[in-house]
């Protein structure tokens, strides 16, 4: 954890002198927010007060109506006044839009700061992709604390991404002043077992005096203790209320994430048993799909849902503001108080956080749900032309085998995967997938290894009547195709290749839906409404070609099927990989008869 600090822009002597004079009553405020109710996230009070602002500073929080001398007065009658929301762990790329478009979506909803792990861009475009992410955030009304991706790829030796980040690469990123720490460390076993590469990466963060953020999915007991002792200080991969409490007790800063909505009620109950909100609990979105972002928002939606599930509204706001600011080591953020930065949200209902007006750095930047001025987008040419793969054939999606029968391994279940085994017929030199099995193929698309698809068998993925292809495929983002028919899989894959990356749904040889994502195969430079509609069409089309097998009804499972850093078998561009054992099978065929 870094020491609480005040960024240099607030230490300007003239600014401070003006603010002090205004606080004394010897000078006018630049802006006065008058007639509202301040949500005090320190005391838990909601109290009537006016807020005087000079430049980017809050100069005074004083009795309502006691001052009227200001260049601009914002009428806050009937409104609550809160610090701007801080999202402590997220990936802009998950929303499939550029940073400028993302900012225009969340700032009018009250989100003024995000902690961005651009490891999706890093996995495709390497250091250049991370540098682009940093530069693209410059000048936006949304403040971004950008982190240095720590696990590119997530499982070295088991997959090939578009780059490899060793300790030297991470140290280089940490030397950039805009980089606020090391992003989620997903190679848990590497840290726990003292792998030299991961040990050096964590040490680079500690040496730089910047936080090392975690990904502690499923860790408990001695493994959890070892992970934290190694220097990791946060986690968002919570699987239950008991897991939340155990990780609080381990001293981790918690990022309660909205992307796993089914767990939020359990977290609310767990926090209720404590009787108070620990100061190490913050909130994050992690991943928000474009249609969800367009309809529901970002961190503001997480706040609303937590309150709906029974969390005190004051606690939810404290977690999303003051606690988050302390986690970031930012003394200037997270509080409506003199001397703090004027990131301020006015909203109507404390139980249904809907922003009326948003100020960032003391300037009114959004009102009535929209930006007052559109954010300026960065150039995107460095992110184009990342599909370094030729069109594929039907045979690329078949599993070669000899004899008449084969013993094969399977990947059982979409989540918390485990090894399975079955027998399958062989015909014409190829495996005949058993009934109820789904084919998954992953083809390297970054030009750093051979691009022949590695094909495996999935159990528990329902009945498929077509194919789905995507280059959004965590975390190496190789071309991944699901389906039951090699013909449909070929059509889907080649549609995505031709589009320069993205997603396609195919049925009976016809493309039913296509979403081009030409920037790293992850993001579009189109407006949010257009991307949201395109992704919604993909969801709808996918729902027509597959009957999900309960309880796995979440389309999101497709994008995590290749996340090789998680325990259990996962298909990658090198084969079927298991990070816990280091096992890697190029083919699912064990033996033939």
UniProtKB/Swiss-Prot annotation:
Cofactor(s) required, per the database record: Mn(2+)
Pfam families to which the protein is assigned, alphabetical: Adenine_deam_C, Amidohydro_1
EC primary class: hydrolase
Natural source organism: Rhizobium meliloti (strain 1021)
Gene3D superfamilies: Metal-dependent hydrolases (3.20.20.140), Urease, subunit C, domain 1 (2.30.40.10)
GO BP terms, alphabetized: adenine catabolic process
Gene that encodes the chain: ade2
Catalytic activity: adenine + H2O + H(+) = hypoxanthine + NH4(+)
Swiss-Prot/TrEMBL keywords: Hydrolase, Manganese, Plasmid
EC number(s) from the headed UniProt entry: 3.5.4.2
Lineage: Bacteria, Pseudomonadati, Pseudomonadota, Alphaproteobacteria, Hyphomicrobiales
UniProt family annotation: Belongs to the metallo-dependent hydrolases superfamily. Adenine deaminase family.
Protein name per the record: Adenine deaminase 2
Molecular function terms from GO: adenine deaminase activity
Domain of life: Bacteria
Database matches in CDD domains: AdeC
Cross-referenced HAMAP family: Adenine_deamin
InterPro entries: Adenine_deam (IPR006679), Adenine_deam_C (IPR026912), Amidohydro-rel (IPR006680), Metal-dep_hydrolase_composite (IPR011059), Metal_Hydrolase (IPR032466)
């Amino acid at each position: 954890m870094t020491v609480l600090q005040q960024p240099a822009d607030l230490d300007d002597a003239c600014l401070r002198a003006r603010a002090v004079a205004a606080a004394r009553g010897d000078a006018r405020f630049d802006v006065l927010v008058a007639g509202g109710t301040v949500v005090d996230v320190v005391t838990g009070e909601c109290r009537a007060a006016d807020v005087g602002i000079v430049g980017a500073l809050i100069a005074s929080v004083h009795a309502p109506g006691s001052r009227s001398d200001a260049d601009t007065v914002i009428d806050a009658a009937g409104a609550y006044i809160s610090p701007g929301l801080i999202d402590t762990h997220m990936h802009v790329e998950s929303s499939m839009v550029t940073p400028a478009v993302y900012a225009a979506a969340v700032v009018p909803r009250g989100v003024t700061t995000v902690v961005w792990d651009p490891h999706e861009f890093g996995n495709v475009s390497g250091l250049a992709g991370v540098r682009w992410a940093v530069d693209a955030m410059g000048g936006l009304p949304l403040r971004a604390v950008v982190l240095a991706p720590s696990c590119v790829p997530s499982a070295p030796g088991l997959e090939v991404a578009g780059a490899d980040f060793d300790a030297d690469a991470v140290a280089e990123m940490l030397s950039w002043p805009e980089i606020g720490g090391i992003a989620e460390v997903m190679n848990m076993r590497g840290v726990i077992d003292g792998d030299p590469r991961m040990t050096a990466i964590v040490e680079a963060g500690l040496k730089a005096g910047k936080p090392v953020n975690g990904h502690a999915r499923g860790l408990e007991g001695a493994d959890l203790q070892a992970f934290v002792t190694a220097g990791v200080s946060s986690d968002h991969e919570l699987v239950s209320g008991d897991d939340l409490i155990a990780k609080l007790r381990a001293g981790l800063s918690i990022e309660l994430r909205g992307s796993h909505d089914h767990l939020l009620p359990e977290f609310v109950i767990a926090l209720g048993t404590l009787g108070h909100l620990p100061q190490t609990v913050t909130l994050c979105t992690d991943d928000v799909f474009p249609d969800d972002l367009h309809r529901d928002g970002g961190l503001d939606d997480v706040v609303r849902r937590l309150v709906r599930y029974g969390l005190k509204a004051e606690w939810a706001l404290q977690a999303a503001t003051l606690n988050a600011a302390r986690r970031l080591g930012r003394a200037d953020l997270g509080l409506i108080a003199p001397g703090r930065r004027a990131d301020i949200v006015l909203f109507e209902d404390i139980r249904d956080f809907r922003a009326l007006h948003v100020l960032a750095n003391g300037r009114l930047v959004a009102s009535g749900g929209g930006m007052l001025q559109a954010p300026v987008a960065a150039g995107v040419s460095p992110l184009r032309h990342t599909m370094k793969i030729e069109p594929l054939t039907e045979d690329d999606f078949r599993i070669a085998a000899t004899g008449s029968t084969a013993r094969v391994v399977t990947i059982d279940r979409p989540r918390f995967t485990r090894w399975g085994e079955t027998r399958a017929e062989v015909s014409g030199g190829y495996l005949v997938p058993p009934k109820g099995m789904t084919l998954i193929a992953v083809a390297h698309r970054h030009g750093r290894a051979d691009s022949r698809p590695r094909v495996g068998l999935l159990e528990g993925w329902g009945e498929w009547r077509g194919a789905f292809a995507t280059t959004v495929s965590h975390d190496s983002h190789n071309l991944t195709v699901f389906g039951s028919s090699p013909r449909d899989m070929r059509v889907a894959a080649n549609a995505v290749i031709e589009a320069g990356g993205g997603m396609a749904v195919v049925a009976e040889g016809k493309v039913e839906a296509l979403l081009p994502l030409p920037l790293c195969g992850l993001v579009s430079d189109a407006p949010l409404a257009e991307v949201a509609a395109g992704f919604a069409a993909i969801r709808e089309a996918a729902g027509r070609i597959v009957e999900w097998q309960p309880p796995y009804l979440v389309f999101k499972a497709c994008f995590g099927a290749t996340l090789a850093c998680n325990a259990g078998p996962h298909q990658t561009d090198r084969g079927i990989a298991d990070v816990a054992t280091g096992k890697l099978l190029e083919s699912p065929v064990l033996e033939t008869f």
